[in-house]
Amino acid sequence: MRPMFKHTALVIGLSISTALPMSIPVAAAPAPQAATAAADQPATTPRGTTFILPEGWTREQRGNAVVLTPPEADGSRLVIVDATAGSADDAVAQAWQALGMAPKFLLATDAAPRDGWEQRRSYDYDVPQNAKRVVNASAYRRGKLWTVILADVDQGIAEKRASQFGKLFQRLLPAGYVRETFAGRSAHPLDAARLQQVANFVEQMRKDFDVPGVAIGIIQNGKVVMARGFGVRQLGKPAKVDADTRFMIASNTKALTTLMLAKLVDAGKLDWNARAEDVYPGFKLGDAATTDKVLVKHLICACTGVPRQDMEWLFEGEKQTPASVLTTLGTMQPTSGFGELFQYSNPMAAAAGYIGGQVAYPGSELGAGYDRAMQALVFDPLGMRNTTFDYVKAQTGDYAAPHGYDINHKVQVMGMGLNDTIIASRPAGAAWSTVDDMLKYVQME
């Protein structure tokens, strides 16, 4: 269970120079011949900023701008141009002007330097809800040069192609910059002094980011060298976090669910290459052809074309049951071809867990069968005594209370309301666990 997709958008990056008037011929000049990428490939802007051109996208160079268009070719676009400007705000403003757009400013947020960029700033804009578009901007600086990224993208495309956008943004690097690699290098032994450095860093970050409590575990050479907590379990109370404090582990649950399936495969009770519908006839998607293609291994590959579609469990989760989750999954239509894109799906992961539970305990209630399978095949063998899907048990004794920001951006103790919505889809992200228990899982891996 990851955070919901939030305004991740296609971007239009424009190179800007304060020494010259902005006249990037993005739309006015005749477009040169476009080239479509047959596979992900490295690419550069005229000034050498590097990025990955995603498979199926079209690249055009127009003056000092690079225009990237997704396969849908519906007007969504990405333009990247390296620039020189006095500030991030100036660079972004001139970039929008060059595109002939003037979106209504909403918020600017600074991000930490990384990947060779000395300054990063992102911008959100107020877009009419019915426009169903994602509009945002990002400015990246190295020295006096800027790369500005502007987004004006259809919301559906932004969601469907989020993995491609992520790859493009995460591989956007300044000209000449080479990421550090640890290949072929040996890690220093984590002696007492280095472990104290780690502890000091974690504690400082915890304070800087107003995190009430955190627990951390480290394994080196197969041995646990750190398992401890920092801060408190609940604001306003003295009880400290330790290695046995239970936290919700969200989508880390998926890895444990997959381990349960693997144990069934090892036992000869399940086949990765069996059709999911043959294993459990109640499995359905909204598209019969896609349903027919889904094998057990595809339930957890995020490759079937089924979109994220989290609103059902977020708005109706407390009313849902495991059975209704599978019923809802049966209405979901794929938005991309089978195997075409990585599209994260919590309902598909939930189906994987519930199908595994039925293989282990045929005829049981979906949730109960899954819970029993996880206990018998994962938690008990690994000695994960504090890992559970029992929310009453989890919130007794040593556990981390939920916290969040109030309207004044102050961290406060919050209710469990939103967290409870995942219970009906629990194979995707509802387990509670501890650092000590998760270290046992990591040691097994």
Predicted regions: what they are:
Residues 223, 227-230, 234, 287-445:
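Short, surface-exposed loop or secondary-structure junction motifs
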Residues 190-191, 195-249, 269-271, 278-279, ...:
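Short, conserved catalytic-motif segment at the N-terminal edge
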Residues 34-39, 47, 59-157:
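Conserved polar/disulfide-associated segments of primarily extracytoplasmic proteins
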Residues 9-21:
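Bacterial N-terminal signal peptides
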Residues 208-215, 237-299, 334-347, 426-429:
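Short active-site loop at a secondary-structure junction
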Residues 54, 65, 89-96, 162-169, ...:
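Extracytoplasmic/secreted envelope proteins and their assembly/folding machinery
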Residues 20-34:
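Signal peptide processing junction and immediate N-terminal pro/mature segment
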Residues 32-34, 57, 145-189, 193:
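Surface-exposed amphipathic alpha-helical segments
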